[in-house]
Amino acid sequence: MAHKKGQGASRNGRDSESKRLGLKVGAGQRVSTGSILVRQRGTKWHPAVNVGRGKDDTLFALADGIVVMKKTDRTYVSVIPQA
């Protein structure tokens, strides 16, 4: 057995801060224009009707309405306007 702790011990112990990614709004929920729907890295969810995509792939609402998600070959997020 080693009688010293080893040189790596004091250099370990770091962890990055979580980025709080994922869905921020569920299907069927009412949203207003500009609301963030999804925070993501890459395009796990794709924008559809009345949904925009930011430069960091964040999806946001372009109109007031109800969130709808549809899964085909990809998962699409839409906002259906409410009268």
Swiss-Prot record:
The keyword Ribosomal protein applies. GO terms for cellular component: cytosolic large ribosomal subunit. HAMAP family: Ribosomal_bL27. The keyword Ribosomal protein applies. The lineage of its organism: Bacteria, Pseudomonadati, Chlamydiota, Chlamydiia, Chlamydiales. GO terms for biological process: translation. Gene3D superfamilies: 2.40.50.100. Residues 1-25 are annotated as: Disordered. This is Large ribosomal subunit protein bL27. PANTHER family: LARGE RIBOSOMAL SUBUNIT PROTEIN BL27M, RIBOSOMAL PROTEIN L27. InterPro entries: Ribosomal_bL27 (IPR001684). GO terms for molecular function: structural constituent of ribosome. Disulfide bonds: none annotated. SUPFAM superfamilies: Ribosomal L27 protein-like. It comes from Chlamydia trachomatis serovar L2 (strain ATCC VR-902B / DSM 19102 / 434/Bu). It comes from the Bacteria. Belongs to the bacterial ribosomal protein bL27 family.
